[in-house]
């Protein structure tokens, strides 16, 4: 039985004071980690303080991206070594906003995934199709290609620890959402791709999230689907009460 994982992606929101207050408000109320994994992925500048604030609790702190190199002349970048040193646990890789706005490619994402495992970070690897690709009937082909390239070079044991987040680009921050059944179908296809590449044990163990306008009022519909192990949530993760509703929903699935 795969443990649900509820991850919030704050994107470029909050001040340091607001971020710390959020963690103080929720850390004592998240469900036990043996029931559901609760993650907040915050801006780089806040990570050190948030890891300290969440220390000793069941709330995990993640980053929203990273570079693939341990160090070097990469102005403005943050390395996996730096994140690990801070005590960060998870890192989102290949989010569509990174691909679209910052020219990240499948090959770059793969380098980051390999680097994350090398340094003991758990990657949340994003994939998803555009509206045009969806309307052309290319959803399964697009996500299969992204997943295959992102996981290249990993071992089955590493794949078992990874998280894949299916986020259809047309549903991110738009208020539109894939139906739970459609999302489940794509997540099932992703699992079949993992099975083909790494075997059925890895496919059964890997956790696959759905992201795209998930909120407290619809999360249970997605969690009820067999292939969906939790959501990657944007806007609905910004308020403590909303985030706690999300993780509590995961506790009962």
Curated annotation (Swiss-Prot):
It catalyses: D-glyceraldehyde 3-phosphate = dihydroxyacetone phosphate. It holds the Pfam family TIM. CDD domains: TIM. It is an enzyme of class 5 (isomerase). It is found in: Cytoplasm. Substrate binds at residues 9-11, 173, 213, 234-235. The modification Phosphoserine is found at residue 213. GO terms for molecular function: triose-phosphate isomerase activity. GO terms for cellular component: cytosol. One of its GO terms (biological process) is glyceraldehyde-3-phosphate biosynthetic process. Its main location: cytoplasm. Its EC number is 5.3.1.1. Optimum temperature is 60 degrees Celsius. Thermostable. Keywords: Cytoplasm, Gluconeogenesis, Glycolysis, Isomerase, Phosphoprotein. The active site is at residues 95, 167. Pathway: Carbohydrate biosynthesis; gluconeogenesis; Carbohydrate degradation; glycolysis; D-glyceraldehyde 3-phosphate from glycerone phosphate: step 1/1. Homodimer. Belongs to the triosephosphate isomerase family. Involved in the gluconeogenesis. Catalyzes stereospecifically the conversion of dihydroxyacetone phosphate (DHAP) to D-glyceraldehyde-3-phosphate (G3P). This is Triosephosphate isomerase. It comes from Geobacillus stearothermophilus.
């Amino acid at each position: 039985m795969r443990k649900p994982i509820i991850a919030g992606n704050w994107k470029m929101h909050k001040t340091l004071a607001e971020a710390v207050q959020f963690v103080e408000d929720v850390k004592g109320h998240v469900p036990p980690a043996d029931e559901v994994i609760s993650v907040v992925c915050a801006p780089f500048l806040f990570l050190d303080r948030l890891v300290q604030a969440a220390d000793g609790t069941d709330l995990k702190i993640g980053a929203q991206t990273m570079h693939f190199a341990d160090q070097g002349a990469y102005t403005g970048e943050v390395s996996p070594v730096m994140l690990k040193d801070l005590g960060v646990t998870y890192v989102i890789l290949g989010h569509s906003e990174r691909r679209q706005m910052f020219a990240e490619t499948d090959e770059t994402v793969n380098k980051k995934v390999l680097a994350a495992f090398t340094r003991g970070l758990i990657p949340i690897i994003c994939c998803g199709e555009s509206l045009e690709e969806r309307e052309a009937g290319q959803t399964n082909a697009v996500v299969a290609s992204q997943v295959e390239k992102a996981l290249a070079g990993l071992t089955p044991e590493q794949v078992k620890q990874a998280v894949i987040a299916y986020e259809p680009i047309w549903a991110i921050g738009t208020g539109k959402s894939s139906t739970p059944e459609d999302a489940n179908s794509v997540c099932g296809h992703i699992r079949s791709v993992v099975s083909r590449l790494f075997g059925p044990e890895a496919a059964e163990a890997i956790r696959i999230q759905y992201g795209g306008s998930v909120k407290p009022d619809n999360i249970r519909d997605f969690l009820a689907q067999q292939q969906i192990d939790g959501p990657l949530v944007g806007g609905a993760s910004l308020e403590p009460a909303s985030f706690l509703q999300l993780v509590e929903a995961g506790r009962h699935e």
